[in-house]
């Protein structure tokens, strides 16, 4: 059974339909790179998988749990589904340690000492162990994004969703964050990433999904799809982002 099963989902904001009959399955350990123009439905798709946005038709399951079932405890589900946005969303008045340990202590009832050790471990994974007691204002944008990733990893999720996590960063800081994503990928984490980083998608993506006007327009193995796009829409998109 796939870890993520998305079947024929549709999503509208008022009269505007942003997802149209979208279906996708993601196996455990797969890395899916979702690409496409702004407004194609990429970010909305991630938010639906996490249960942050309701759908009007179809179904979404994560590890056998139906996300769109009214009986589903979404807070419990989100312990298994981490999501990192392009805005870092760190609490400015809390230290890095407290930002990371807040959810494990409150949601998973971890002891403070245990939660702090997990925080230290995930910060080590993102190369920021020495920033354990720093505050967000003392960090660069790239460091803040790495802390945001560490915060999600601290919940030990089965699935990680990344929504254009490098788009607000300067090129040199983008490299820092991509190295962390590469490390998470190499650890075997199942990931769905909305990204414009085609090099990352080519090297680490199991598959690439190209969204266009609310639909999955083209899908395939990452290297092959990016090297030989079949549709004019994908060819045009790749020409724009690669040059």
Q: Which residue stretches match the model-derived regions?
A:
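ABC family nucleotide-binding domain
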Residues: 2-222
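C-terminal boundary and immediately downstream tail of ABC-type ATPase nucleotide-binding domains
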Residues: 212-213, 217-219, 223-243
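Absolute protein N-terminus
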Residues: 1-2, 243
